[in-house]
């Protein structure tokens, strides 16, 4: 199983800029981006967890 460059970029962004990682993964500004922006303002760690879930574990 090879790790693609897109996945590496999304992982780095999910840790440092979670809303941007979700935006790039989804290719649009959807509800998950808005939820993640709100999470970033109030709780940064849950925003990172949400971004990791959205980019890597969501089916």
Curated annotation (Swiss-Prot):
Subcellular location: Membrane
Protein name in UniProt: UPF0057 membrane protein F47B7.1
InterPro entries the record matches: PMP3
Stretches that traverse the bilayer: 5-25, 37-57
One Pfam family in the UniProt entry: Pmp3
Gene Ontology CC entries for this record: membrane
Domain of life the protein comes from: Eukaryota
Keywords, alphabetical: Membrane, Transmembrane, Transmembrane helix
Keyword Transmembrane helix: yes
Similarity field: Belongs to the UPF0057 (PMP3) family.
Location, primary (coarse class): membrane
Membrane topology term: Multi-pass membrane protein
């Amino acid at each position: 199983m090879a790790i693609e460059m897109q996945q590496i970029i999304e992982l780095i962004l999910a840790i440092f800029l979670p809303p941007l990682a979700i935006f790039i993964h989804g290719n649009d500004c959807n509800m998950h981006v808005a939820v993640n922006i709100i999470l970033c303002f109030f709780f940064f760690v849950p925003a990172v967890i949400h971004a990791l879930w959205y980019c890597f574990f969501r089916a």
